[in-house]
Amino acid sequence: MPRNISFKAVGPIGETEINALPVKEVGPAVGYYTQCLGFTLVSRDRTTAVLRRDDVQIGLAVNGQDPEQASCWFSVGDVDALWREYEAKGIGPGIVDEQQYDGKPYRVFFAKEPYGVCFCFTQL
């Protein structure tokens, strides 16, 4: 995995709790996040898991919340390289688009995990 992709920051979109992203089952979710999204497992029990990639740490939780209502953003070093990594793994990320925030351009793409959590990957 190229180092220039580097996950730098994570934040919630809406009411999503970054340390408790909702999943239906911890085991399959950990498999997806590690094998497909490139995270490393830090800790796990029956209903929760903590994962890390570079400078970013997230949590998964079987907490009764609807994964389809959860979303978060990740700031990465090279959004195009990450898009290629995920495309090669069959994740089917959305197109990379250039947008503006506060008059400054940034690159972005979106992807969903199997339970429905939506991710926004950005490069400022």
List the model feature ranges, each with a label.
Residues C36-L41, G90-P93:
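Conserved acetyl-CoA-binding loop of GNAT-fold acetyltransferases
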Residues S43-D45, V62-N63, Q123-L124:
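Acetyl-CoA-dependent GNAT
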Residues M1-V30, Q57, A70-C72:
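N-terminal beta-strand motif that seeds the catalytic metal site of vicinal oxygen chelate
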Residues P28-A29, R46-A49:
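Short glycine/proline-centered loop/turn elements that form peptide/ligand docking sites
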Residues Y33:
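Terminal peptide-recognition signature
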Residues T40-D45, D97-Q100:
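Conserved catalytic-core motifs of GNAT/GCN5-like acyltransferases
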Residues M1-G11, E15-K24, V50-R52, N63-L124, ...:
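Vicinal oxygen chelate
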